[in-house]
Amino acid sequence: MAEKIDLQPADRPLLEALQQDGRISNQDLAERSAMSASACWRRVRALEEGGVITRYTAIIDPEKVGLSFHAMVHVGLSRHQAHHVETFIRSVMTRPEVLDCFATTGDADYHLRIRCRDLSAYNAFLEDFLFALEGVSTVRTNLILRQLKHETRVEV
């Protein structure tokens, strides 16, 4: 589990503004946060170095780039030895179709959120990759019909 960082009072407005617009200039960010540009720059750097800000990214509409198939895949492992778990995790991390991978409790060991072109591409992902992984015993797929909420911001 990641170590919690104690945020300074000035960090919260910085983080809120950066989550709304990761391309905001340092000058505009400083003005919004009521601090000097140099103090703002130092606080942002400290948040990056402390691992609070992990990266800056653009959010792409997957439908507009041809990735219309969206599913949650529930995976069970038959073997939970460290080697099998590490191999599964390492393998899943290399796959561009896997947007999220969660280790979970309940009836599945892992939940994967998948995006790909279509059902045929998903079938290839299953047959060529997931079913071929040593230790995978069960795979259950739930198709996502509509995404009602997708939020990247977190409350700080």
What are these regions (language model features)?
Residues M1-V156:
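A compositional/biophysical signature of low hydrophobicity enriched in polar/charged and small residues
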